[in-house]
Amino acid sequence: MRLSEHILSNLKKPKFTLKPDVILSPGGPKTGYEITVEDRIITYVGPAQSSGSLALTGYAIVPGFIDAHTHAGQTFGKSLIGGEPSQIWKRIWNPMEAALTPDTAHISAKWMFLEAMRGGYTCLVNFSTNQRDLNAAVHRAAGETGIRLVSSSAVDEHYTDQEGKSAVRSPLEIAEMVEDHLSLCDESTQIIPSICSTSFHTNSEDALIRLSQMCIDKGIKLQIHSNEHFPEIQDCVTRFGKRPIEFMADIGILGDHLLLHHATLVTDREIELLSASNTPVSYNPLASIWKGNAVAPALAFQQRGVKFGIGSDTTSADGFKNLSAAEACQRITHCMPIDDFSAGAAWTWTSAASNGSAVAAGIDGSVGSLLSGLEADFLLVDMLRPECMPSHDFEWEFVRYYNRDQIDAVVISGEPVVFGGKAVNWDDESFINQNIGTAYSVASAPEIIRVHGPSSDHRPSV
């Protein structure tokens, strides 16, 4: 059976059982298995036993990708980064996000969520500097599309006010901002709250300690960019005599309540500090390729027990492109010099892209794996493509040969949200056509500076 309305009608039922050729379980690919979903929840995954299951010959069911690090306010600037030197956030992202209004924040987020779901993502971990009005707009976009969202609000002690002046928040103001964000996230079961500290230098030591403790007390994640670029490392060493992860360990804020983003420029000692404190990180391979200074040692993380997920950092919303990059980056930077051809043996990356990201984001108790009792977030993937046939090793093929156009259905909380590449419950074509002008406008904020400029500027004259 190929893609059909019959499949879609079954996915829309409150209870359904599917029997594909392959189910990607936490223990690897399984054949002869079925999955039952009832009222949003997976109630059974195991050997086929139901006479009423829908046979899906030529299909695989896999966990939805979870993007462990992205920025929903940067959607329309992604192609501006071509050739740009690092610390793009100073020249492109900060001006773009500072110019967002509730309307443009909503459009930017909804556009990203559509891209992400088409790319196989069922959940995004958003890092934002948004205050309440912009986050409300982002949450509205999440509700309209059906995506799962780890929402965030930047709670920086040192910040720039609306007049462009440096300002400082009091401890009371910071506590009130945390509570306000929590209350906003309570409005939807598919929105999970988190808090951001843009970096170690946007909060004092005391503020970081207080913020860390608040997140522990509230049971939410504190997201921090860490060890991403050379200037950040040098600044931390100059100011504190320590590298960023060493500094955070010294003030006692490392732990599983944190989610550190990038961690590319790390020493062996810093890896050990992450491992000893059970601090998870996001591994962003495409960001390293396109705009980074280094590649995170993800295989070293794995070997030393550092939990990590895979993030896009607003490079590409194609889950397969990020999955392939995750393996390729490790193969080239860490495995090729020592003649290691396994480079994680494929399963490392399929696991990191789903359950690994869920663990890093602190949501593995509800999503990230195809297990009974978890919410039904999964992809229906067409296996009958020449690029993937004949099949000998599903996970290697999934990492290296599968493509976004093989995703026939995206299911979140047991409900189809994308089918055949199109949104199920809203008109995505009309949305794009109506808002393409806004997309160009957002990417043309007056303070944006491109150092490299368009590709055509560098083409030799003929």
Task: Spell out what each predicted region is.
Residues 1-50, 60-61, 454, 460-462:
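N-terminal metal-binding scaffold of metallo-dependent hydrolase/deaminase domains
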Residues 36, 79-147, 173-187, 434-440, ...:
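Alpha-helical scaffold segments that flank or form the walls of functional sites
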Residues 64-75, 221-230:
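Histidine-centered catalytic micro-motifs
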Residues 76-107, 158-171, 230-255, 277-280, ...:
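Active-site gating loops and adjacent loop-to-helix segments of metal-dependent hydrolytic enzymes
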Residues 128-132, 194-210, 289-290, 360-362:
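Active-site glycine- and acidic-residue-rich loops that bind
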Residues 137-264, 269:
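Metal-coordinating catalytic core of metallo-dependent amide/deamination hydrolases
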Residues 250-257, 299-385:
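His/Asp/Glu-enriched, well-ordered alpha-helical/loop segment
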Residues 375-425:
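C-terminal cap of metal-dependent C-N hydrolases
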